[in-house]
Amino acid sequence: MANSAQARKRARQAVVARAHNGSLRSRLRTAIKAVQKAVVGGDKAAAQATFRTSMSTIDSIADKKIIHKNKAARHKSRLSAAIKAMTA
């Protein structure tokens, strides 16, 4: 239990930050799944368009340090490889 006023305030702020970070993390997972769904669907043009929008989402979440930059790079690399592996 937080005893000092400072600790109580930090606990309140942590609750808000946790909710916000969870929301951003959910956006990340949704963006990744959208690209994967387009790849499975077989439409390369749609997959590329979805990938372009997802890249900015992934980068912005990494910039906010919600995920590590290397994890963001790994996601982008794997999604890009999946799109390149598709037959045109």
UniProtKB/Swiss-Prot annotation:
Record-level GO cellular component terms: cytosol; small ribosomal subunit
Keyword set includes Amino-acid biosynthesis: no
Keywords associated with the record: Ribonucleoprotein, Ribosomal protein, RNA-binding, rRNA-binding
InterPro entries registered for this protein in UniProt: Ribosomal_bS20, Ribosomal_bS20_sf
Domain of life from the UniProt record: Bacteria
Keyword ATP-binding recorded: no
GO molecular function: small ribosomal subunit rRNA binding; structural constituent of ribosome
GO biological process: translation
UniProt xrefs under NCBIfam families: S20
Function of the molecule: Binds directly to 16S ribosomal RNA.
Family from the record: Belongs to the bacterial ribosomal protein bS20 family.
Name of this protein: Small ribosomal subunit protein bS20
